[in-house]
Amino acid sequence: MKFFFSIMLLLAQPALSQIINIDQARAKKTVLAIPPLLFVGNPSSYPNHASIGSELYRVIQNNLTFSSFFSFLPQSSFLEDSKLGVKPVPEPNGFKFESWKQIGAEFLIKGQFSIAGSTVNLEVFTYNVSTQKLVFGKKYSGSADQARKLAHTFCNDFLKELTGKEGVFLSKVVVSSNRGGSKWKEIYVMDWDGANVEKITNHKSIAISPAWSPDAQKVAYTAFVQRAKSKTRNADLFVFDINKGTRWLVSYKPGINSGANFDPSGKYIYLTSSQSGNPDIFKITLDGTQVQKLTNGPTGAMNVEPAVSPDGSKLAFSSDRHGQPMVYVMNIDGSNIKRITFAGRYNATPSWSPDSKKLAFAGWENDHFDIFTVNADGTDMVRITSSRKPNGKWANNEDPSFSADGRLLMYTSNRTGTYQIYISNLDGSEERRVTNDNFDYYKPRWSGNL
């Protein structure tokens, strides 16, 4: 069944554009109480109801934990039976606000769900405990295999209601990985929290450097493919259409065709190509025609890893034109090139914030990579990561990507031995691990909500 949700007209007071101040939430987290979700129906008729309810609850709590705005009261502290209804007294079987106020809850999330055939109906009510008012209530419906999506959608709505800014819980990640223990690297798509992993390439080769189109319906990537009548593999650029399940070859000039990045319109791709000798940055259409060269040396220099700003006005890239690789920014037409990073001996993989005001990048210093952010004009550089391996040696933190709301950074780290995906706040705080296995992940790229 196609996923859908319906908004119930349950508002008990005028909608508040912002209840929680995002900046203040950094200093003091809002205290939430979330009792287990109630099942409405005959348990014997739906033996899978417990697993569905557990998954809904787990996803909601995990999402809101990752948001970093909230702390949670343990269920052992609850004074009321969790089987009480989702509405307050005097409703039959209603709960009492005083029971939640006594244990320090600022907001109470009460939810219930039912199952009709293959459809799950989730109904959630959020209450301000101090004012004893309903903040909002919504009903979400979808097939049982989309229970996670129901929970993600509620969490996005919850954050939008309380902070004025939607969450990122319906976003996806595209990444290169050797999952399955293969000697090859293929391209995978997963939910932002590491669930629902789907392999989208099967080149049985090295597929790297994936990039989302602006609408997250296409993925550009590079794969080292075998050419006909040749023993060598070439780094060719492909685009994969997720909805149609089709792919096509975009750039296959001899040499490098890599580091693709879509422009905001989705009509053009910026990539690194060595078709004229040394690697330079080119702009091409999605069918590989209308090629425009944007950088030209200097002689012997490499210009790689293009990243178009979300507003479409600038392009960041890595270049060793002054000796060591550093990050540069230029106008989208290739003019007015300016070096903006000076972190250690090697700076690479620039990634723009959604507002086009900041860049994140990986910088090599003291024999390891860390993630840094810097303003687009080169000011206010900040180190985001610093981690060690179990043996005490410095770990590498690489390949940053901003969340669509600009509040979070995703990156890879080899602190556990293999390169796993992590997320932190923009200041590096509250770092959390996304993937938990023994495979390696490279260059994750974070989409907007889908």
Where are the regions a protein language model picked out?
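Short, solvent-exposed, polar/charged sequence segments at loop or secondary-structure edges
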Residues: G41-R58, T65-V120
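Amphipathic beta-strand/beta-sheet edge segments enriched in Tyr/Trp
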Residues: I19, P88-D157
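Hydrophobic beta-strand positions that form the internal "hydrophobic ladder"
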Residues: V173, V219, G266-I269, G312-A316, ...
